């Protein structure tokens, strides 16, 4: 094996090339690789945080939805109670108004009946007076009396 100057020159050139690469090429490559590794690690950490945040947000949304349903049910229940109360109040007021109208109607009927009775008494009294006048005008005849009384009864 022959060691000639070419082999030594190539070895020296290779050593200079390796030194040059280690000094000027290798550090920027390592920095780029480390930066990429850091970005990937940060991205994975952010993804994990995002997943956890999403789970928390979903749990919170579920809780809020449950609370909203409970609140809605309470509001509906209160509305139904209020509706029943209003209906009951309306029934009570309607019953009171009905009783008032019935009492007023009965009072009006009673007043009208009393007025009619009074008018009837006046008419009966007038007829009795007219009958007595007719009886007195005629002679005192039992047949005539009976006839006049029958006419009065028919008029009444």
Curated annotation (Swiss-Prot):
InterPro entries: ATP_synth_B-like_membr_sf, ATP_synth_b/b'su_bac/chlpt, ATP_synth_F0_bsu_bac, ATP_synthase_B_chain. It is a single-pass membrane protein. It comes from Shewanella oneidensis (strain ATCC 700550 / JCM 31522 / CIP 106686 / LMG 19005 / NCIMB 14063 / MR-1). F-type ATPases have 2 components, F(1) - the catalytic core - and F(0) - the membrane proton channel. F(1) has five subunits: alpha(3), beta(3), gamma(1), delta(1), epsilon(1). F(0) has three main subunits: a(1), b(2) and c(10-14). The alpha and beta chains form an alternating ring which encloses part of the gamma chain. F(1) is attached to F(0) by a central stalk formed by the gamma and epsilon chains, while a peripheral stalk is formed by the delta and b chains. Its main location: membrane. Keywords: ATP synthesis, Cell inner membrane, Cell membrane, CF(0), Hydrogen ion transport, Ion transport, Membrane, Transmembrane, Transmembrane helix, Transport. It is found in: Cell inner membrane. Belongs to the ATPase B chain family. This is ATP synthase subunit b. GO terms for molecular function: proton-transporting ATP synthase activity, rotational mechanism. One of its GO terms (cellular component) is proton-transporting ATP synthase complex. The lineage of its organism: Bacteria, Pseudomonadati, Pseudomonadota, Gammaproteobacteria, Alteromonadales.
